[in-house]
From Swiss-Prot:
Residues 21-47, 186-222 are annotated as: Disordered. This is Large ribosomal subunit protein mL64. It holds the Pfam family CR6_interact. Acts as a negative regulator of G1 to S cell cycle phase progression by inhibiting cyclin-dependent kinases. Inhibitory effects are additive with GADD45 proteins but also occur in the absence of GADD45 proteins. Acts as a repressor of the orphan nuclear receptor NR4A1 by inhibiting AB domain-mediated transcriptional activity. May be involved in the hormone-mediated regulation of NR4A1 transcriptional activity. May play a role in mitochondrial protein synthesis.
Amino acid sequence: MAALAMRSGYLLRLSVALGPRSRSYRAPPPPRRRPGPHSPDPENLLTPRWQLTPRYVAKQFGRHGAISGVPPASLWPTPEQLRELEAEEQEWYPSLATMQESLRLQQQALEARRQAREQRIAECMAKMPQMIENWRKQKRERWEKIQADKERRARLQAEAQERLGYHVDPRSARFQELLQDLDKQQRKRLKEERQRQKKEARIAAMASAEAQDSAVSGEPSS
């Protein structure tokens, strides 16, 4: 225990003794830049890229003047750069006449879209009564078709019950099979009836056309 206390005291005295020496250390100042212009070496790989740009050269001339060694004629933009600057200026800072023309074209486009929208609305409103009438007609036809299917189904069920007897359950497989057969037979008869009517209509149309041709050919020529 006494040895540990003696060792701690030794370390404390050593730190006190080394303290002033560590505080007396002063790092050397960084090297100062020369007041004259700086000419970067393009052959040196350690030269930063931004020091080789025309912008840096222009800054050197603006800071140090003629002693920078930069010829003033090299600071003027080339004809291609001038054209690019003019195009950029026209894009970002257009003239008053250009802005007025652009505003006029925008207003003209807005007016054209407004007129087209109003015309489309007027056309839709003009078609609205006929559209409502067509919708009501389709709704009525669908309702009539549903009612006709219900009546046809009821007649088929009545016919099936007459054939099998009223004691047969309509939900039985035998009753449903007979109902399907009767439905197929009826659909077949309706299809044949429609085909017959179409055939008769074609024959009547052909006869009417032949009669008209005969009447035209039988007229005396003047």
